[in-house]
C-alpha cells in the first residue's frame, strides 16, 4: 500500500484539517489484502462487518488522486458499519507511489496522468471478482469514487453490465482526451449500465457548473437513469474531512443520499 507517510495521508494532501474523521473499527474487520489482476498482485484495503449473515453487498471505493490513504480507508470503514463489504484497490501501484510527490501538480503530471483508464477498469473487474470469492454478493455490486475516482465511477458504470448502482463524488465530467483517457463521462452517457448519482459542489472551480449542465443534458438526451445533485455552498472535495475545503453539511447530506441510492438500486440487505 502507499500509505507509508507517518500521518496516514499522502504528502500532497497537506495541510491537514482538524475536522478529519476516524471511524472506530470495533464492529468491523479491516485490513490489507492482495488481489490478482492482469498478471500482478494489486494491494487493496478492505473492511466488512464482523457480524454478518450470508454474502454481503459490495461497494468498490475508488481513490482520490492521493491514493488509498487514510481518508479512503475510513470511507471503507464507514461503509462496513452500514453492512457492506467495501474494497479500495490501489490503482496506481504499477506506475508509482503518491507518497513520492510533494504537491498536487507534480502528482498529477508525474503519476496520475500515466495511469490508463482501460487498465483501471480491468483492475476494478478483478476487484469485483475477488469480492465475490471473499464473502461478497456478486449480484449486489456497487461503486463509489471521489475526485479522480468520481470520474472513474462514471466510466465504470458504462463498463460493467453487472453493476447495480454508482455514486460519483465531484468527478471530472468533460475535458481533453488522451491515449490514456480517450473518453470522459459526458461521452458515455448513452452507455450507462447502472443508475448513477453525481454529487457536485457549486463553488468547485475545477469542475465548472457549465460542465455539470452539459452532463445533465447528455443524460437527459440518453434517457439515462441518473441524477446530479449540486451543493451551492460547497467546493471541490467537500467530503474530504481532512482538507480545509470540507463542507460538513453537504458531506453529510451526500453520504445519506449515497446510502439511499445504494439501498434503492443496489439491493442492500435489509
Curated annotation (Swiss-Prot):
Q: Which UniProt keywords apply?
A: Hydrolase
Q: Write out the catalytic residues in the record.
A: 147, 204, 236
Which major enzyme category is it?
A: hydrolase
Q: Does the keyword Metal-binding apply?
A: no
InterPro entries in UniProt: AB_hydrolase_fold (IPR029058), Dienelactn_hydro (IPR002925), Dienelactone_hydrolase-like (IPR051049)
List the catalysed reactions: 2-(5-oxo-2,5-dihydrofuran-2-ylidene)acetate + H2O = 4-oxohex-2-enedioate + H(+)
Matching entries from Gene3D superfamilies are given as:
alpha/beta hydrolase
What domain of life is recorded for the organism?
Bacteria
In Pfam terms, one family for this protein is: DLH
Q: What is its EC number?
A: 3.1.1.45
Q: Which GO terms describe its molecular function?
A: carboxymethylenebutenolidase activity
Query: Which PANTHER family does this chain map to?
Result: ALPHA_BETA-HYDROLASES SUPERFAMILY PROTEIN (PTHR46623:SF6), CARBOXYMETHYLENEBUTENOLIDASE-RELATED (PTHR46623)
| Assigned protein family | Belongs to the dienelactone hydrolase family.
The name on file for this protein is Putative carboxymethylenebutenolidase
Gene that codes for this? ysgA
